[in-house]
């Protein structure tokens, strides 16, 4: 399933891009999003010469799941790693999301880009999610549920970002 999500932020593109690789933003602001724990920064490598940051974030789901999903996964084992390489110069990134416990359950990858959108900026995510279900016709339903949850959380990220910026300015 292909998906596209666009977010609007009240900050210039450089500030937004820098926040997305700032450990305090990841821990404090991302932890305010519904149904997931604050991500744990497993690794972060800055390549000054290339102008990139590669980071691995471990997430855990802590919300309610639709019954169609709980038939196949245990909510307490629903954890995943988001491996992202951010190009700070072009304000673009490539990401891959890999389940920790259900390694063959789904594959998700994509890109995002940040561009100016007065009075702030916008981030556009383009991705692809494939659920490998042993039951015919269920994979598509699970894909829709996962993308719907992702969209819901990402719609709330600009408010978490604004809160984080306000906390930094105190």
Which residues fall in each region the model found?
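Hydrophobic ligand-binding cavity/cleft-lining segments
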Residues: 1-65
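A generic beta-sheet turn/junction motif
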Residues: 9-11, 88-90, 118-120
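Glycine-rich portal/gate segments that line the openings of hydrophobic small-molecule binding cavities
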Residues: 40-97
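A conserved amphipathic terminal alpha-helix motif
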Residues: 81, 85-88, 139-170
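Hydrophobic pocket/interface hotspot
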Residues: 16-20, 125, 161
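Short, solvent-exposed secondary-structure boundary motifs
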Residues: 28-37, 71-77, 101-106
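Beta-strand/loop substructures that line and gate deep hydrophobic ligand-binding cavities in soluble
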Residues: 53-55, 80, 85, 94-148
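Short amphipathic alpha-helical segments
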Residues: 12, 17, 76, 149-153
